[in-house]
Amino acid sequence: CIMKMKSKTKSCCQYTQWVVLALLTLIFASCKDNDDATGDFDPNKPVVISEFSPKEGGLGTRMLLYGENFGSDISKIKVTIGGQDSKVVGAKGKSLYCVVPAKAYDGDIKLSILNDEGEEIANTEANEKFVYQKKMLVTTFLGTMYDGNTKYDLKDGPFDDCGGFGGAVWLSFDPKNHNHLYLVGEQHPTRLIDFEKEYVSTVYSGLSKVRTICWTHEADSMIITNDQNNNDRPNNYILTRESGFKVITELTKGQNCNGAETHPINGELYFNSWNAGQVFRYDFTTQETTPLFTIQDSGWEFHIQFHPSGNYAYIVVVNQHYILRSDYDWKTKRLTTPYIVCGQQGAKDWVDGVGKKARMHAPRQGTFVKNPAYKGSSDEYDFYFCDRENHCIRILTPQGRVTTFAGRGSNGTSGYNDGDLRQEARFNHPEGIVYDEERECFFIGDRENHRIRKIGYEE
């Protein structure tokens, strides 16, 4: 399962990988010092791979080959692992430093020596196979930009020609059709990503600032929030499945709503007014709206996300950089006064830690993902969320521990890079995230890269 990667294991693996790399570099440097007399390729001698290290790994693993007569001109050395071309970093006679490529599933290691015309003049193969392990990567799923990653076209089209994405602040699968993924574009149109047709289309546009999508209890209608400043205008609209989610009807009124969510079991709607820090409850049966409580900060954006069990909801306070928990009272069918589970009011930073010691900078949408390691526990879900201004994806455990899952690759911050979750991948203001249980991967709305990114095991 995708979530077997626990935070401690990840940290340990990353540390070990860098230690191995450092050792390989030292060993290779030593080999270079000792191989001066045998550095050049000798066509009268055989090429031999006698050993390699490490014996197992995945994409990006640094590998050393040991043997005889490799030569030292890397432009004339070709290495394949599992039939895939490997990048040769350096060579000196009896040692060679290369990088494991993607999809090297078969694990056979072959080395060829080429002449000036690129023709093979000698070759060899290791007696033992490398054990290739699939790894979790960040990739680009949809979206293109041009002019040095500064411009994009907003258009409908097939997956390979759908332009870029404006906004990308919220993602939600249709509960009745898992091939339909909806993307909220805030001031940009809401889009439908159709996996079956492999096509991106516009669902609706024209509202001032759409922030979130949720669904009625039976999933017969979609509910969208519209963040506007008039208390007498609608703040939540309902779009029926029967209309193809094209007809917009007023549901509730109020200003400054940027978050709404239905209870996963009982179905009532909870929404906010961030201007006053208020949380409201809407009853579909009585059509009554009831104010419940205010959070400790007024005038700051926040949104509400329910745990799948319905036992509690997280209230993510974006601009004040913390996450609250509001427990659900099953007798009164209401959310109760919330309390902080991670972060601290007004304290923006990037720090992994527990509870109020953790630091975030504008947390945004999250998604609950079942963790097999928690089986039998009272809470079996981690909460993966976008940390927008830190340009990364974080994990919040049921115990309140926050760790960094992906992004900020190569000790950087923002950018556009695919690859290893922490060593290479970079985002630019990620805001929307959803976990796809069927495909066992995450999709991320990478706002300023105007793309949909994907996190999953390489295919």
Region roles according to the model:
Residues 114, 176, 184-187, 225-229, ...:
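Short loop/turn segments immediately following the C-termini of beta-strands
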Residues 26-30:
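C-terminal motif of bacterial Sec signal peptides marking the signal peptidase cleavage site
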Residues 428-459:
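Blade-level signature of beta-propeller repeat domains, shared across WD40, Kelch, NHL, RCC1
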Residues 65, 134-167, 197-211, 227-230, ...:
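Gly/Pro-rich loop segments of beta-rich domains
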